[in-house]
Amino acid sequence: MLMIRRYHCAVSATLLLAGAAAFVGNAPPAQSDSKPVVISGDHDPIQGLNFRDESGAFSTFSTTGHVDLKNAFFKSFGTNGRTCQTCHQPKFGWTITPASVKEVFDDTRGRDPLFRSNDGTNSPETDQSSIQARRRASSMLLLKGLIRVGLPIPPIAEFALADVDDPYHHASSADLSLFRRPLPPANLPFLNTVMWDGRENKAGRSMHDNLASQALNATTIHAQRSVGNTLSPEVLQSIVTFETQLFMAQTYDAHAGWLDQNGGLGGPQS
């Protein structure tokens, strides 16, 4: 088993990471300053570093030995400034949390691509003319870390829509508002379903192709990729390969300590 090296280092990468949220040593700090710092370069300091969470700390391991920030995962293919990383933040477990969303909102006054009205607000028709309006418009994202997914009732649904009572005045049978937290693009080789509801799983299609379809649809739906901007098979392959090489797991528990010591096999390398 590979052991995580715990050491202080100075590295550069084009990513927003927490300064004191990542820690090294025998125990996590008493508290975390989540203020992001901007770093630049090709490879990031994520590999082998431990980021605090509610029960201790977790770490990311890529089978390539580093997380490549030049990968298509970190590039924008749409029209609204988003990348995959917008909703899949490494320091927050490759997803978003209310704390991370609030941090981004406060730093950008709610103008970050994360808060685009196509799915970052409670309704696509909501008012975003002022910071107060933007805060109200993205309340589900700010308070619960949830992205709005608009889907029609599927033909095979085992239910019928009897009535609509939407406080945000948008949902209908043609566009249900489903609020969900983005799933981490890590530990994917262990999965047999893509998406919360499995809608990217198609009969006779491999998991690789399911993931490629998900990446393609994400750039269309969440990043608002234009119809004429076709993604090549090489780009989709790059994203899927990147994701399937990522593994994430708890490395430190507040009660048990380091999970790879005293015979323990904790951590993403396991």
Model-derived features: positions:
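Bacterial N-terminal signal peptides that target proteins for export
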Residues: 2-13
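Bacterial N-terminal signal peptides
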Residues: 11-22
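Short intrinsically disordered, low-complexity coil segments enriched in acidic
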Residues: 1-2, 174
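Periplasmic c-type cytochrome electron-transfer domains
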Residues: 28-270
